[in-house]
Amino acid sequence: MDLRYQTGFGSYFETEAHPGALPVGRNSPQKVPFGLYAEQLSGSAFTAPRHENRRTWLYRLRPSAGHEAYQPYAQDKLVSAFPGPATPNRLRWSPLEIPAAPTDFVDGLVSLAGNADAATLGGIAAHVYLVNVSMKNRVFYNADGEMLIVPQMGELTLVTEMGVLKAGPGHIAVIPRGVRFRVEVEGPARGYVCENYGAAFRLPELGPIGANGLANPRDFEAPVAAFEDIDTPTQVIQKFQGALWAATWDHSPLDVVAWHGNLTPYRYDLSRFNTINTVSYDHPDPSIFTVLTSPSDTPGTANCDFVIFPPRWMVAEDTFRPPWFHRNVMSEFMGLIHGAYDAKAGGFVPGGASLHNCMSDHGPDVASHKKATEVVLAPHKIDGTMAFMFESRWVFRPTHLALESAALQSDYDACWTGFPKARLS
């Protein structure tokens, strides 16, 4: 499928899949063209400041309101409340295996950790998805938060109310709270999801960097209008207050013929990130790699930062170039899309994950430290890699499933054993 996109982060778009479907000069005329139904999707309170206000007007074949009551839907691997004890221990997981049984995106979501619940309107949850079939006659939406999807294996086709996005390894996609979508795959697919209960992701402030750098607004892509006119029973599953609920509609809800607004799904190619780094000495703080941020009520302290560690040149003189040893007030959930991470010589592999909570000691392993302290420093490019981090002010609590999983590496702490003691003489 040859898809078209509209470009710009947080831009105001208008698009129609059928000529003349968009009303002119008003949002909800007495008679919408072609008898379509006008519906506003609000992503913020009506009275939110203009620069924070997000909403889109949808013009659809049938009103969304015409459906039966929702009933509970069982999916015990996906959770949104994390009552279990937090742990100060460093945790690392090997990739979880994709099931042999047919499993679509909804049934393939597995929660690893989180630091709030949906009712708080703050915090995040970190999930993985393990998928081998497309969603068929099913549509999903999340009333609890927006979903930042990080594919690691296999391309996803995201068929949304507002159009179609494709996202494979090296891209991310963000689906706003409440937007309905279906996930289609060509084969096995695995990746990560940051479920954000707090303020919507936005671009970070650039400060002294200036007007350009990091993720540039023009590189974000939103879909153009596309719709389904399908009168086939469709199961609509929603996530509401941490639980899944399902109802059968008599048609596909992906029937939006035209829309205008600034609340949209979008995708971003991580290879377009304009990486900032030192050209003199030292390893700057990893905040320079922030792609998107969800702010909290404390300025400069994020509900969640989405950070990447992309290909980049290392040129610092008289410097230990990998990430240094660290104890952080923030908590860090990491994943690896492809390649290797420069602070870990082994064990942290594509599709895996790690968790370092607030003030948990972490840093390079013995092999990486030895190599970095002995290498002859010359300009060097770290290439063929893409790691990422969901960093949050809130401590993550791992799920029972994550702690009991065979993928949990029981020997993770061993990577920091064997450092020789410094000698003062």
Curated annotation (Swiss-Prot):
Gene Ontology BP annotations: L-phenylalanine catabolic process; tyrosine catabolic process
Enzyme Commission (EC) number: 1.13.11.5
Cofactor(s) essential for the protein: Fe cation
Domain of life where this protein originates: Bacteria
Pfam families, sorted: HgmA_C, HgmA_N
Sites where the protein binds homogentisate: Y341, H362
Reactions catalysed, as given in the entry: homogentisate + O2 = 4-maleylacetoacetate + H(+)
Entry GO CC: cytoplasm
Keywords: Dioxygenase, Iron, Metal-binding, Oxidoreductase, Phenylalanine catabolism, Tyrosine catabolism
Pathway: Amino-acid degradation; L-phenylalanine degradation; acetoacetate and fumarate from L-phenylalanine: step 4/6
CDD domains (UniProt xref): cupin_HGO_N
Annotated catalytic residues: H283
PANTHER family: HOMOGENTISATE 1,2-DIOXYGENASE (PTHR11056:SF0)
Quaternary state and interactors: Hexamer; dimer of trimers.
UniProt record similarity statement: Belongs to the homogentisate dioxygenase family.
Name of the protein in question: Homogentisate 1,2-dioxygenase
Naturally occurring in which organism (per UniProt): Caulobacter vibrioides (strain NA1000 / CB15N)
